[in-house]
């Protein structure tokens, strides 16, 4: 990966954070195990594949995914599977083969039956790949956001990628909940999904489709945070490292250390395969996932979005899914105003901004001491104004939000 990201973040080594305080862990693909489902397909197994497609979102979702993942990775040739495994091991991942399900029970609930009915010999592989890329989004999207994506965007996006049949993928809430329950960080089936995604990324003929429909839409990889930093820094006309210094208040230093480490690793990646190996290590490694915790950096994300929101209301779409208290939301608006004022009017050499931010924090703390702490809210906005999101049903409460 040349230019862009590497040049923008080359100065992060100079950020004034105590290096003895501990930084984010280096992401090592070799510490992450990927799963590859294997099992021979005969000439009469076409019905098994179609039944598996129809069964997505039903009681046998995991079994169905194992059949579909086995099909897209190996087709009807064991040699193809071995070649795909080599791609993953060359990226540095550990790869374990696991037997796929042998079939789907007849008469079982088939939520994706309408999609399966669009299949023929010519489009089977493309439809299955498109469905799997869509399912991969549930590693990050909430159930409600996924339903919105399917109903409003998937059909058009599928058409642009030559898979218009995806408009028939069901947005039934029960089916999406079932899929969401299977495709979560740390799950075996999720590691198999991303084994497939990574092999598609390695193929130049399918890279653009994956980037449009799958992996790059997952901001849980940390790339959203890098994008927010880049956008905010560009708007302010300053290097990302200088902006990061301003944001390193005591309460945010730990998150900042992790961000620095992630940015350094991504900026030093020399190929798209290496970059995605780093990103997927974060998504798929259970220990990494716990140490990074998707919402650890939500406060910084919120501030960055508010900064860019001063320049373009559309930038506030980056706040979608980030949970903060009303008190902190007000605080981020003040911080954004101070930073914009610093770089547009006060001047880049000013040292006043940190004192202003600290005093603002003290004022908010004093105000908060006189009233109960407000409950954290999930702000979603496409108009630049925060709106409280209703809490999802109890069995989806623990699903991660959309912040890094």
From Swiss-Prot:
GO molecular function: RNA binding
Cross-referenced InterPro entries: Rhabdo_ncap_2 (IPR004902)
Subcellular localization, as worded in the UniProt entry: Virion; Host cytoplasm
Signal peptide coordinates: none
Region of interest called Disordered, as start-end residue ranges on this chain: 357-404
Biased composition (Acidic residues): 391-404
Basic and acidic residues: bias regions: 357-376
Origin: domain of life: Viruses
Pfam families associated with the record: Rhabdo_ncap_2
Family listed: Belongs to the novirhabdovirus nucleocapsid protein family.
Function: Encapsidates the genome, protecting it from nucleases. If expressed without protein P it binds non-specifically RNA and therefore can bind it's own mRNA. Interaction with protein P abolishes any non-specific RNA binding, and prevents phosphorylation. The soluble N-P complex encapsidates specifically the genomic RNA, with protein N protecting the genome like a pearl necklace. The encapsidated genomic RNA is termed the nucleocapsid (NC) and serves as template for viral transcription and replication. Protein N binds protein P in the NC through a different interaction, and can be phosphorylated.
Protein name: Nucleoprotein
Organism per entry: Viral hemorrhagic septicemia virus (strain Makah)
Gene that encodes it: N
């Amino acid at each position: 990966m040349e230019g862009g990201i590497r040049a923008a973040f080359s100065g992060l080594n100079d950020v004034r954070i105590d290096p003895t305080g501990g930084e984010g862990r280096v992401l090592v693909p070799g510490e992450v195990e990927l799963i590859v489902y294997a099992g021979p397909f005969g000439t009469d197994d076409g019905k098994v594949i179609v039944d598996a497609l129809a069964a997505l979102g039903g009681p046998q979702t995991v079994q169905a995914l194992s059949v579909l993942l086995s099909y897209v990775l190996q087709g009807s040739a064991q040699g193809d599977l071995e070649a795909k495994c080599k791609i993953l091991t060359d990226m540095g991942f550990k790869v374990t083969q696991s037997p796929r399900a042998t079939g789907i029970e007849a008469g079982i609930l088939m939520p994706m039956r309408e999609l399966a009915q669009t299949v023929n010999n010519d489009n089977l592989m493309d439809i299955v790949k498109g469905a799997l890329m869509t399912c991969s989004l549930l590693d990050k999207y909430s159930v409600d956001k996924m339903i919105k994506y399917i109903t409003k965007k998937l059909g058009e996006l599928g058409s642009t990628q030559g898979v218009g049949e995806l408009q028939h993928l069901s947005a039934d809430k029960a089916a999406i909940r079932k899929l969401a329950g299977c495709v979560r960080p740390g799950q075996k089936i999720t590691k198999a999904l991303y084994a497939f995604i990574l092999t598609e990324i390695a193929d130049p003929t399918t890279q653009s489709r994956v980037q449009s429909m799958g992996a790059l839409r997952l901001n849980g990889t940390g790339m959203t945070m890098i994008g927010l930093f880049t956008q905010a820094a560009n708007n302010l006309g300053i290097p990302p490292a200088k902006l990061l210094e301003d944001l390193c208040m005591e309460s945010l230093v730990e998150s900042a250390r992790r961000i620095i480490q992630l940015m350094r690793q991504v900026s030093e990646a020399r190929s798209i395969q290496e970059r995605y190996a780093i990103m997927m290590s974060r998504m798929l490694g259970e220990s990494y996932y716990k140490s990074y915790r998707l919402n650890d950096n939500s406060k910084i994300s919120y501030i960055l979005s508010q900064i860019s929101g001063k320049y373009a209301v559309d930038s506030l779409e980056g706040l979608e899914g980030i949970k903060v208290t009303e008190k902190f939301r007000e605080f981020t608006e003040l911080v954004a105003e101070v930073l914009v004022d610093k770089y547009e009017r006060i001047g880049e050499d000013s040292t006043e901004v940190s004192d202003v931010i600290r005093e603002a924090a003290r004022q908010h703390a004093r105000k908060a001491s006189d009233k109960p702490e407000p409950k954290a809210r999930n702000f979603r906005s496409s108009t630049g104004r925060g709106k409280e999101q209703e809490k999802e049903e109890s069995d989806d409460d623990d699903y991660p939000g959309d912040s890094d």
